[in-house]
Amino acid sequence: MRLFYYKTINNHNILWFKRVIEQKPNNHYNYFVMEKILISACLVGDNVKYNGGNNKSPLIDKLLEKYELIPFCPEVEGGLPTPRHPSERRGDSVINDIDEDVTDNFYRGAELAFNICLYLKIKKVILKEKSPSCGSKIIYDGSFSHKEIPGMGVTAEYLKEKGIEVYSEDDIDSLL
């Protein structure tokens, strides 16, 4: 197990948080020089999805051999609870299924993700496809009818605009 402490600054507030993830470095040298990747927390098995579940990827162990993974959920870190109402993007806004505007939470999470990337010098992120925050190629159309459309989630779009390489779980093989 590996304990991480990170500090990020957002609107003059300092946020400290810790994450515990299992690391299996090949040797001590690699342990300290592995490239860091910010990854959707649900992909490493954290129960942060809107319904309280996760989307653990079977390729996480392979990624851990090559990268130091920094789990992060922009929706939770942006202030939304788990579980929570499902949300979908409508233009620049994000609305949940009971018609509440949760846009501010999504943009706050995106800014925190970028601050972590800056602080830790992270150049790549792996995000959950179809998510209103993390989708990198496909999102839902905002009608809650499960209709998929080309588009990006708030965090994916924000990070890409800031020069961070954005991948989805479908792209993990290209990183191995």
Write out the residue ranges for each language-model feature.
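Extreme N-terminal starter segment of soluble prokaryotic enzymes
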Residues: 34-37
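Divalent-metal-activated hydrolytic enzyme cores
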Residues: 77, 87-112, 116, 147-176
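Polybasic, lysine-rich low-complexity intrinsically disordered segments
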Residues: 8, 24-26
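Short amphipathic alpha-helices and their capping/turn segments at secondary-structure boundaries
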Residues: 57-69, 109-124
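Short, surface-exposed acidic-centric catalytic microdomains
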Residues: 55-96
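Short, well-ordered beta-to-alpha junction loops that form the rim of enzyme active sites
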Residues: 42, 128-131, 171
